[in-house]
Curated annotation (Swiss-Prot):
Transmembrane segments: 3-23
Membrane topology: Single-pass membrane protein
Gene for this chain: petN
Organism encoding this protein: Pinus thunbergii
Places the protein is found: Plastid, Chloroplast thylakoid membrane
Functional summary from the UniProt entry: Component of the cytochrome b6-f complex, which mediates electron transfer between photosystem II (PSII) and photosystem I (PSI), cyclic electron flow around PSI, and state transitions.
Family per record: Belongs to the PetN family.
GO cellular component: chloroplast thylakoid membrane; cytochrome b6f complex
Subunit composition and interactions: The 4 large subunits of the cytochrome b6-f complex are cytochrome b6, subunit IV (17 kDa polypeptide, PetD), cytochrome f and the Rieske protein, while the 4 small subunits are PetG, PetL, PetM and PetN. The complex functions as a dimer.
Keyword Ribonucleoprotein applies: no
GO molecular function list: electron transporter, transferring electrons within cytochrome b6/f complex of photosystem II activity
Keywords: Chloroplast, Electron transport, Membrane, Photosynthesis, Plastid, Thylakoid, Transmembrane, Transmembrane helix, Transport
Protein name (Swiss-Prot/TrEMBL): Cytochrome b6-f complex subunit 8
C-alpha cells in the first residue's frame, strides 16, 4: 500500500463520482 497508489485511486473515485453527478444532473434524473 503506497501513498501514491492510494492517492490515485481516491482521485479516480472522486472524479468518476463527480462526473456521474454532472451527467445525471444534465439528464434531469
Amino acid at each position: 500500500m503506497d501513498i501514491v497508489g492510494i492517492t490515485w485511486a481516491a482521485l479516480m473515485v472522486v472524479f468518476t463520482f463527480s462526473l456521474s453527478l454532472v451527467v445525471w444532473g444534465r439528464s434531469g434524473l
